Every structure is written in C-alpha cells, then in structure tokens.
Amino acid sequence: MSSGALFPSLVSGSRSSSSKYLVEFRAGKMTLKGSTVTPDKRKGTVYIQQTDDSLIHFCWKDRTSGNVEDDLIIFPDDCEFKRVNQCTTGRVYVLKFKAGSKRLFFWMQEPKTDKDDEYCRKVNEYLNNPPMPGALGSGGGGGHELSALGEGGLQSLLGNMSHNQLMQLIGPTGLGGLGALAGPGLASLLGSGGPATSSSTSSSRSQSAAATPSSGSAARLSSTQAPTTPVTPAATSSGSPTVTPTTPAAQTPSLPAGPASSTQPIQLSDLQSILATMNVPAMPTEGSGVDLASVLTPDVMAPILANPEVQQRLLPYLPSGESLPQSAEEIQNTLTSPQFQQAMSMFSSALASGQLGPLMNQFGLPSEAVDAANKGDVEAFAKAMEGSDSKTDDGDSKDKKDDDEDMSLD
C-alpha cells in the first residue's frame, strides 16, 4: 500500500526539475539499534521536496553515491524535527513521529553552527505548513506540465493508472491536490483542451512512507567530526530519549478495491466532471449527509478488527518495509490515524457529491454500488458493498462445496 506519485514520471524530468528543494543541509544518518544510536559516518544531505503531486517528502541521500536512501512522505502534524540536547558530543537532531514511537536520528555535518536553528525551524515549517501548489514560482507548479501533456497524453495517463494511483483521486491529497492544480493549469487544460502530445510511460515511482534499508556500501569518513559517543541512557548523565520499536508514520491508506474493469478506461470528461465540483462542498439532498469518519470510529471498528479473518484480508494493504511490520497492531494504528480519518471524510464528501460513479465503475464495483455513487447516496453505497461482499462469500462457499462433491465422485 505504498503511495505512488500520480504524475511525475509522465513529463520527462518533472520530479527533479519542477520540484526544487524547500530546504537542504549536510547531515549524516544515525543507526538505531535497540535503545542505542550510533553515527553513520558517510557524507549525507537532508532535504525537503514538494513533488508535482503536492506531497511533501523528507529525504536523506548519500552525497558520495548520490543514492536517496530515505524518502518519507510527510503529512502536516505527522512529526517534529528537533535537536537532541542530551547528546553533547555532536549536533544530533531527531525526526520524531507523533503517532507511535518512531524516531529517525541525524547528525549535522555543516561546518558552521550558525544556521542550525534556522534549518531546524524551516524543516518544521515546511513539514507542518507546506506551501500551496504553484506558490513556489515557475518551478513548482505541476499544472503547467500537465497542460503540456495535452488531451491525448492525459487520456493515456488515466487509462494506465493503477488502482493505488486512482485511489489518490479520492484521498486527502488527491482531491485537494488535484483541485488546487485545477486552478492555474489543469482547469485550463480541461476547459479548452491543449494540443495533444505523445504520452510518456505511465509507470510511476513508488514512494514509501517509511525509510528504506540502508545500503551495504562501505561507510565513508566525513570531514566533519561525527559524534563519538552513542546516544544511550548510560552515556549521558541527563539521559537520552529512549527509543522503542518503531511504528510507521501515519499515511493515507489505500482502500481495498475490486478488480479493475477490463472495459473502458476513465474518460477525460469524467475527470473534468469530478474536478469541476471537488472543491465545492456537496449540498445534502435529504437530511444531513453521512460522514463515514464519524460512523467508523475506533470504538465501532475495534470488535471488527479483532476478527482474525478481517485482519488477514486487511494485512496486504498495509505499507511494507523493514521498519513497517505487517501486523494486527499496525492495522489498528493505520485506521485510527488522523490521515485515515481525514481520508474517510474526504471520501464521504466526494461520494455524496454524486461525481464518483465513473471511478467506482472503473474499479469493477457492482452496478448497485455504481448507481449509489452516481446518486451520491452514501448509505446505499455501503449496503451495496456489504451485499457484494456477502455474495462473494456465498460464491466461495458454493465453489468449495462443488469441489468437495467432485472429490467424493473421484
């Protein structure tokens, strides 16, 4: 359930040329083993980047090899970047996630200390208050590059999106991000239709919301002195922060979807219709609208998530990675995260608008669910999905019974 960027790979060099670093400074990684943190002596760079899909990435790369080893998608209020005052042998900073006990440590490699506080302030500012799309000048707006695709290129893009990429259209960064892009670039493209250009490949680079494992290359000594003492409770009198087993930063989960329809891809007119209303709150037709986030509360979900069968069905949709264990506890952490609750609210609003029918049809959902999505009836949509699930279970039971009968005939 990794978060794949929707558009970067479609315009040559879009991810690097159109997304400048918001802040960058030289810093090395620190390796966490148990409750001990030891410095990785390679020369590195920490930087924050806003990509064309409006997501904020916190990255660390090896300055010698140029390899980006850590690329985390960060949402506002996910984490805090601050100095570890308990460490007196070096300028150590920690990226501390608020959901769980996950911490990533770095040690400053800038030769001068006069800008340390400024770097720390900027990191927190951009992580928790990301700039609006297009606010970074000509280099930061993805809408202009979408316009360069033309109608033919964008149509090709929509037809080749994977399920996870399509799900971003109904996630917090999808609806909000595309709605914002619709202003300067995408709206003009959809309104007038730009000149068709040849489409590029549609394989998009998957960005994990967790740090990737460090490479096994030999560590290179930095010209700046590394902290000589591991950050441990025994090493300092004041004690360093105790680091417990890591948990992932909360991210927007991809909702389980049915098999992709093998018929027609999403049409450009469908996306135009969706974008036209996604930033306008839907007016309830009868009574008050249903907010799934207020219905699927942790108390309601707890007994459901305790079912081992449900857990096994949800585990494949969890993020994967060395520091991201796929367990029942992680299911609970994901579904109770603020990002998931926000995604549920956004999905409810989008579903109530009656504009998600084409997307639901693309996911291969039953006709009852598609009809409910076209009508903006959240309750009917939920019942249709529940009925579809029951039919699937009945079908599986019937198939198993037929198999048993065939075996008895043998």
From Swiss-Prot:
GO terms for biological process: proteasome assembly. Residues 191-264, 381-410 are annotated as: Disordered. Residues 281-395 form the DEUBAD domain. Keywords: Cytoplasm, Nucleus, Phosphoprotein, Proteasome. Its main location: cytoplasm. GO terms for molecular function: endopeptidase activator activity; proteasome binding. It is found in: Cytoplasm; Nucleus. Residues 191-257 have a biased composition (Low complexity). CDD domains: PH_Rpn13. Residues 17-130 form the Pru domain. GO terms for cellular component: cytoplasm; nucleus; proteasome complex; proteasome regulatory particle, lid subcomplex. Residues 381-401 have a biased composition (Basic and acidic residues). The modification Phosphoserine is found at S18. Belongs to the ADRM1 family. Component of the 26S proteasome, a multiprotein complex involved in the ATP-dependent degradation of ubiquitinated proteins. This complex plays a key role in the maintenance of protein homeostasis by removing misfolded or damaged proteins, which could impair cellular functions, and by removing proteins whose functions are no longer required. Therefore, the proteasome participates in numerous cellular processes, including cell cycle progression, apoptosis, or DNA damage repair. Within the complex, functions as a proteasomal ubiquitin receptor. Component of the 19S proteasome regulatory particle complex. The 26S proteasome consists of a 20S core particle (CP) and two 19S regulatory subunits (RP). PANTHER family: ADHESION REGULATING MOLECULE 1 110 KDA CELL MEMBRANE GLYCOPROTEIN (PTHR12225), PROTEASOMAL UBIQUITIN RECEPTOR ADRM1 (PTHR12225:SF0). This is Proteasomal ubiquitin receptor ADRM1. It comes from Danio rerio.
